[in-house]
Each structure stands twice: as C-alpha cells, then as structure tokens.
Amino acid sequence: MFKLLLIEDDESLFHEIKDRLTGWSYDVYGIQDFSQVLQEFAAVNPDCVIIDVQLPKFDGFHWCRLIRSRSNVPILFLSSRDHPADMVMSMQLGADDFIQKPFHFDVLIAKIQAMFRRVHHYNTEPSTIKTWCGAAVDAEQNLVSNDKGSVELTKNEMFILKQLIEQKNKIVSREELIRSLWNDERFVSDNTLTVNVNRLRKKLDALQLGAYIETKVGQGYIAKEEDKFYD
C-alpha cells in the first residue's frame, strides 16, 4: 500500500481527501505540527506528498524546497489561489504536478496515479515469471504453462491472476480487484470483472487449474495452493 503525506491545514478538506484516498487503498498521513513538517516527512517516509501552498508558519514552497533537497518523492501542490506564478514556482522547486482548488476528486486521483507511473514504474518486477500450483505464470508473455500445456491470457486476465497469486490463500475482494485494475488504467465494471474471471477460470481448466480459482460469494476470489482447499 502506498503511503501519502497530505500537508493540508484545512481540517475539513484534509479529512475529506483522506477518506476518499483511503477508499482507493492509499495509506494517508497528516501533519501534527506545521513547524516540524520536514521532521514528520522523514518519520513517515511517504511514497508521495500532497501539499497546500498556503500553510501556517511557512508556506508550501518552503517545505517543498527542503523536501526536494533530500528526496525524489513525487510532490503534488494544491492551491486555492488563481495565480499562474504559483504553478511556475512549484515546478521550479521540483514539484511534479499542481492542481487548483476546488478540484474534482477524479482529477486528483488521476494525477496521483500518473505520478506513480512515472516515478515508481507501475507493474515492474525483478522477474515477470512466478510459480503457482506447479505452473509457470509469465506476466510478460501472458502465458501460463505446466505439464498439461500452455494457455495464453489477455492482459486483464493476467493482471487478475497476478493479483490473486500475490495474495494466494487469501480472499481478494471484488472491490480491491476493480480498484487495482483502475489504478493500472484498465477501466472495468463489476460485470466486466465477472466475465474476465469466468474466462480466466475456463482457460485454466485446460491446465487442470481452473478449480484453484474459487469464488467466495459476497466476498471475492481466492487463488488456492494445490494442498489448500476450503469449504
């Protein structure tokens, strides 16, 4: 889970943004003492910073300058002022993006996701091949292979399988899968997820693996190991 440090002194707006971001599976931290922003930044060690221009004690530009001198963490500025100079200043200080208040929450999410794609390189792994139930799961080639043969998956099917394997023997909710797909810009609906899982299971049947992807009614899905079955 990515950690976000939200540096916003408007408590109402802070809690509104935090609640929405938490719903997208981000871990959101705030600032307790606005004279100690740098120390609190170091303590949290966030994956992303969202910072308002206007803050108590020192403005956001001051803290951006100090944070950027110590870290390459993505920084997104918020501002209620309609001043082009604010955007120019934020970029000159090393911020990655800027959004003016009031803003639509979907725009904020899109900007955060874009920063993570640029900086953290979504979906890059040291190895794209995993093993599961005696099969090789090649995420780069979208292939699953075992001694029964090989099947080719679509990108969405492979993405879903990877998410389930990474949490094997644990229930992954439908909501979590949909959020993950949206985070990766694979825009799917609830019905589309059902279709993809059913299609994935049918393809895995050719390798005698379909039964290892189990539906938990009202909860989600689970990728089981060969020796772990559930009632």
From Swiss-Prot:
4-aspartylphosphate modification, residue list: D52
Record keyword ATP-binding present: no
Regions that span the bilayer: none
Free-text description of this protein's post-translational modifications in UniProt: Phosphorylated by BceS.
One Pfam family of this chain: Trans_reg_C
GO molecular function: phosphorelay response regulator activity; transcription cis-regulatory region binding
Protein name: Sensory transduction protein BceR
Record organism: Bacillus subtilis (strain 168)
Organism taxonomic ancestry: Bacteria, Bacillati, Bacillota, Bacilli, Bacillales
